[in-house]
């Protein structure tokens, strides 16, 4: 069955195109800094928002019109796979991501859930072979079912801990089966609502124990996969242990996991943590831990995870600049963890929204490439820190100074002159690259 009969494959037509179903900026084969756009951007579509989100919210019923159905839950799951791969092919996107519960019903037992996953991943595997589309990452949903109300790896219930381990094990089996290059952990319920009844050290140690089991199991089945943790400060849990990039790196370092994990960073999660997305990316780069990103944007006027499609060129420019400075994002990618607005309820909006996001990231890439070629930020930073290039500054960096010698220097040079940062000019010049 064809779900988008009236829509042809989305092609690049240029900025003058009036065709809604065409890329105006994303030209997959266009070479930027020696690589094609599709190599730089490594776009992926998220199964959950694309196939299971229905447009409902806490105040209103579902609005999304989706021409996919089934007489049983499994028939619906199979039909969703067909529709999903049609979307990927229409967009020319080469990667996808999913949670286990996105693709198959849980049934009445863990055993039934695993059988359902086997059947659906057989179908997905066939579609991957037919299309050449690849799995960017998968993960286990350890937050929706009521059993996870007190967490999965951080739970106070040993039976829940065992169930969670079984679900992760199956996720890694599926990752190997489908050739996944990354596996994600997002701890939506790994945290606390009150410290009054929480042993934080115990819970975090159990989380680390679970991660180490995952590493060992991946080695046992000879599956080379990049493990990723996705930070988020809150929602659904009041305080989540993977609050932001820096907090997550502190956790990984404490438990000796920093060489086994990188970060999957999401723009809207950065907003909730009180950071810009480029801040989180820069922190991850500092730790050599930038693994993959979830592309979306939040609303600064709202206090929750709105998961909007990215349309802000300023943000995507600074995002792509960090990725270029990182030497790229592979084997990770740019996954659109974004959902259409409740008012964008038609089937075609799924394609239009992804086109908007892909075009916005393409514009960000081109602007970031120009910033890189011009050494725009490099020159500014070189000038700003030039006092450390010679004299006392150079000696400090060479570890030739100590408190005594620096005190002697300060006493002899106590008339200090600072220089203006001219930051308004810098921001204005940055705008020149965003055309």
Swiss-Prot record:
Ranges in a coiled coil: none
InterPro entries xref list: Xyl_isomerase-like_sf (IPR036237), Xyl_isomerase-like_TIM-brl (IPR013022), Xylose_isom_bac (IPR013452), Xylose_isomerase (IPR001998)
GO cellular component labels: cytoplasm
Textual note on the cofactor: Binds 2 magnesium ions per subunit.
Enzyme class per UniProt: isomerase
GO BP, sorted A to Z: D-xylose metabolic process
PROSITE patterns, per the entry: XYLOSE_ISOMERASE
Catalytic activity of the protein: alpha-D-xylose = alpha-D-xylulofuranose
Entry's localization field: Cytoplasm
Binding annotation for Mg(2+) 2: 266, 269, 305, 307
Active site per UniProt: 99, 102
Subunit organization: Homotetramer.
Family: Belongs to the xylose isomerase family.
Protein name: Xylose isomerase
Naturally occurring in which organism (per UniProt): Listeria welshimeri serovar 6b (strain ATCC 35897 / DSM 20650 / CCUG 15529 / CIP 8149 / NCTC 11857 / SLCC 5334 / V8)
Gene that produces this protein: xylA
């Amino acid at each position: 069955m064809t779900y988008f009969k009236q829509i042809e494959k989305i092609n690049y037509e240029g900025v003058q195109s009036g065709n809604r179903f065409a890329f105006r900026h994303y030209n997959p084969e266009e070479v930027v800094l020696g690589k094609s756009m599709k190599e730089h951007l490594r776009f992926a579509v998220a199964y959950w928002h694309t196939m299971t989100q229905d447009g409902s919210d806490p105040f209103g019923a579902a609005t999304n019109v989706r021409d996919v159905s089934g007489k049983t839950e499994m028939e619906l799951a199979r039909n969703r796979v067909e529709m999903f791969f049609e979307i990927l092919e229409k967009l020319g996107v080469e990667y996808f991501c999913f949670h286990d519960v996105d693709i198959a019903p849980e049934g009445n037992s863990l055993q039934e859930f695993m059988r359902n996953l086997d059947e659906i991943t057989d179908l997905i595997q066939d579609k991957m072979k037919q299309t050449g589309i690849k799995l960017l990452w998968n993960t286990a949903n350890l937050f929706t079912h009521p059993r996870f109300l007190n967490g999965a790896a951080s739970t106070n219930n040993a039976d829940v801990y065992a169930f969670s381990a079984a679900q992760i094990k199956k996720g890694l089996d599926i990752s190997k089966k489908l050739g996944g290059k990354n596996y994600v952990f997002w701890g939506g319920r790994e945290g606390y609502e009150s410290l009054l009844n929480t042993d934080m050290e115990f819970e975090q140690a159990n989380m680390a124990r679970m991660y180490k089991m995952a590493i060992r199991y991946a080695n046992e089945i000879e599956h080379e996969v990049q493990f990723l943790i996705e930070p988020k400060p809150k929602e659904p849990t009041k305080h989540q242990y993977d609050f932001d990039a820096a907090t997550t790196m502190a956790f990984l370092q404490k438990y000796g996991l920093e060489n086994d994990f990188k970060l999957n960073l999401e723009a809207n999660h950065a907003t909730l943590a009180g950071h810009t997305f480029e801040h989180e990316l820069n922190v991850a780069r500092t730790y050599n831990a930038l693994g993959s990103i979830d592309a979306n944007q939040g609303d600064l006027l709202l206090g929750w995870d709105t998961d909007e499609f990215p349309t802000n060129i300023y943000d995507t420019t600074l995002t792509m600049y960090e990725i270029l400075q990182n030497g790229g994002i592979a084997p990770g990618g740019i996954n659109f963890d974004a959902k259409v607005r409740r008012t964008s309820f038609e089937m075609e909006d799924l394609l239009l929204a992804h086109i908007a996001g892909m075009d916005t990231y393409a514009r960000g890439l081109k602007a970031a490439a120009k910033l890189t070629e011009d050494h725009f930020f490099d020159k500014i930073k070189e000038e700003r820190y030039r006092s450390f290039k010679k004299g006392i500054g150079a000696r400090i960096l060479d570890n030739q100074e100590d408190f005594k010698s620096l005190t002697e220097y300060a006493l002899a040079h106590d008339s200090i002159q600072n220089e203006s940062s001219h930051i308004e000019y810098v921001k204005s010049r940055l705008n020149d690259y965003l055309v």
